[in-house]
Amino acid sequence: MTYDTVVFDNDGVLVGRTRFDVLREATEETFAQFGVTDPDPDHVEDMTIGATPSEVATVSDVYDFEPEQFWRTRDRTVSVAQQEEARAGRKTPYGDLDSLADLDVPMGIVSSNQQETVDFLLDHFEISGLFDTAYGREATIESLTLRKPNPHYLERALADLDAESALYVGDNESDIRAAENAGIDSAFIRRPHRSDWDLNVWPTWDIDSLDDLHDICSA
């Protein structure tokens, strides 16, 4: 199969993932900004990763937050924490990222991270020139319903790139499902945190490195 477009997830694919404790501390800081210094640990956990609109509504009701303001502040605080991780050298690109410079197809990014974080990382690591489009989430509660496996942002990227035969590369099962929902092929990349991962989905390709894309895209 020859692909004319490749789209990537960002965290865990192009750059290293942010440690969970960093995200949790940033979420705790968000509560503190609203005057809550001892929130229920379960509420912090719910707001750290994978929050749903209903969970945001529940937490906001418990602490008398305005939901959109709380979530906007949470996203901003978590983004700033990730930016600091990058500046400190604790969140860095994977070593095989350079191989994409020779991949002669239009490329894009679709991440469930904040748009602010995606934009910062592209600029900070000076890799924005590799990609023709890049989508993250807006800092809104509605964006939580548009995360992968919803193909919303992926379909926007494919439209930007005028893709006819596209491949989406990810490190999560939600990435593979998003590709399926968008009607395109997928590649699951076996980064160290996924080396022994047992999949419950069926990607088109199972790869160890971004280098593998050269053979795949010309197969």
Can you annotate each of these PLM segments?
Residues 108:
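Extended substrate/RNA-proximal surfaces in nucleic-acid metabolism proteins
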Residues 2-102:
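N-terminal helical cap/lid subdomain that shapes the substrate entry/recognition surface
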Residues 1-3, 105, 115, 121-219:
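Asp-based, Mg2+/Mn2+-dependent phosphohydrolase catalytic module
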Residues 111-113:
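Conserved phosphate-coupling serine/threonine residues in phosphotransfer and NTP-handling enzymes
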